[in-house]
């Protein structure tokens, strides 16, 4: 995992999102719990319906170095990759 803001991590729980229909319920929960983190599948992250707090999202699995840089520059919390040893 590549993390942008490791020092600010205060959550011990989160939601795994791998289907687009989970976004609406997750958004409602994000408004109720500011410590809730989201592990978001890459294609869901790029969905036009994606509207979660970026600073609480980890995007998976991103295996292209340029794409990793682009996603991290969007201020997400982190990225999961299979190529960490090649970066």
Residue ranges of model-derived segments:
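Short loop-to-alpha-helix "cap/lid" segments that border enzyme active sites
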Residues: 1-87
């Amino acid at each position: 995992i590549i993390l942008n803001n490791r020092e600010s991590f205060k959550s011990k729980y989160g939601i795994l999102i791998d289907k687009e229909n989970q976004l609406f319920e997750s958004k409602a929960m994000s408004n109720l719990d500011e410590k809730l983190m989201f592990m978001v599948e890459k294609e869901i992250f790029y969905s036009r319906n994606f509207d979660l707090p970026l600073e609480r999202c980890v995007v998976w699995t991103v295996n292209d170095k340029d794409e990793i840089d682009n996603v991290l520059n969007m201020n997400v919390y982190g990225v999961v990759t299979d190529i960490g040893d090649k970066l």
